């Protein structure tokens, strides 16, 4: 039996003025994110691009990289070529922005039609501002399903009066570690997170 809790280390790349963050903040229908991710327990590392289309569907594309390339993967041919072909931003304009670490539990139902991830002990450091932050009392749960099927977990959350809230770890980390960034549309979510932490 494998480890039940896995550790992840992620570094998001963006332009110096955080255009990918701003696109999310401004609710652009189509947007992208670029990150390097290390699956610490297996030693695997990837360059990953997340694309969200105007139908609110997110698709991820990735290629393997060396762990040693984590902090400057765009200096290497494979990642640079991949990003040039798949990302709608000039590669030379991209810099490491926000790094995060967290622990994850992954649960899959027997029919493999439902996948649940539980992220905890989330910490951030901003490579641009040098500031760091942590949300040790916050747990982010994400449910992915194949089609519109009944979900036992959704019923449990409904019974507990827990309503879904959309949140991006990149955007959360940016807001918490960059006091100069615009964050008007995230203030309500930040208040909600603070309220949750105070009630624990």
Question: Which residues does each PLM region occupy?
Answer:
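Phosphate-end processing signature that detects enzymes handling 5′-triphosphorylated RNA
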Residues: 1-200
